[in-house]
Amino acid sequence: MEAKKSKNRILTLFGSGETSPHMAKNYRHIIDGLSHDLQKNLLLDTPFGFQENNMILSKKIQDYFASKINLKLKSLKLTSEESYSNEHTALLSNADFIFSGPGSPTYASKIWLKHNLGDVLKNKLKSGVVMAFASAAALTLGRYVIPVYEIYKVGDLQGLNEGLNVLDFLGKDTVIVPHFNNQEGGDHDTSHCFIGKKRFNNLIDGLDVITIGIDEHTSLTFDLDKSIMNVKGLGNVYFISREGEILLKNGDSMDIKNINSNYIPKLVEKKEDLVIENDPVIDYVNIDIESLLEIRSVARNSKMYEISDKIRDLLIKYGIEIEDKESITSWKKLD
């Protein structure tokens, strides 16, 4: 009789771009390395459950996973306090894959905490699950939650809210900050998930916490079986505490044990200080031009011009010229 395969224990946090076409490879990278099939897959839709168009948003997310990742997600339909039933807990407890994303972190965390879903998610990470939490949902998994809407839209500086503390495996209180490098404000600071660096520092003043800052269009994956975390995407991930800062870039990985109960961070200035997983040396390149142009467009819209220019230079290097006309980018092979 064939032994039952144990389920992988993986948690991925997205800074943004969780349903962008160019981020599909981040999901595939995880799924391709699994030891078990993903059969019971859920969309935890609470963060945007208060929105009138929540069913439309659910459908868009389900369509993305079906077409880009080849995963069918069942919407949990836990959109409000009144909608909760014990079946929701049962479904989460038996899930193979759980995705949750945009919306209000405080709206979601209040409902999840009331029904002990934080403990359910912790137990799932112990027994085996792939969790992908992005934006608002990612915010809820720390010891504390930033009340983003309340601060950014209303100006209510009420302080941090209680989080689910799913990242307690790090052995330290955490605050997760997606959209860490946001620049949409233009003439005012919208980094640190739209509230700005100054307001964020005021929120954590006096707290002994690790701030996990995840740049936009960037993912941080914790593989609890291998005790490894790695970063993929356009930006960086920052682990910041009173003692210092650790910076992980695209392609970097590090042992989770370096940021646990004996947390003694050092400011990482040299890439060689990190444990890097490098691909084998290859002597040819197969470029997906349209995907690169899409990433470049995202970088330009986010004012990440250095990345945009590097993509242009890379394409030129391999004989591809690109031309920007208003909102349209075209390309052609160089003679």
Show where each model-derived region lies.
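Glycine/threonine-rich flexible loop motifs
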Residues: 105-115, 186-187
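Catalytic nucleophile loop
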Residues: 99-102, 125-145
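Catalytic-core regions built around general acid/base machinery
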Residues: 33, 91, 116-128
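Portal/gating segments that form or line small-molecule/metal binding sites
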Residues: 48-107
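C-terminal and late-domain segments of enzyme folds
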Residues: 2-37, 48, 52, 56-59, ...
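Structural preference for alpha-helix termini/caps and helix-kink/transition segments
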Residues: 269-335
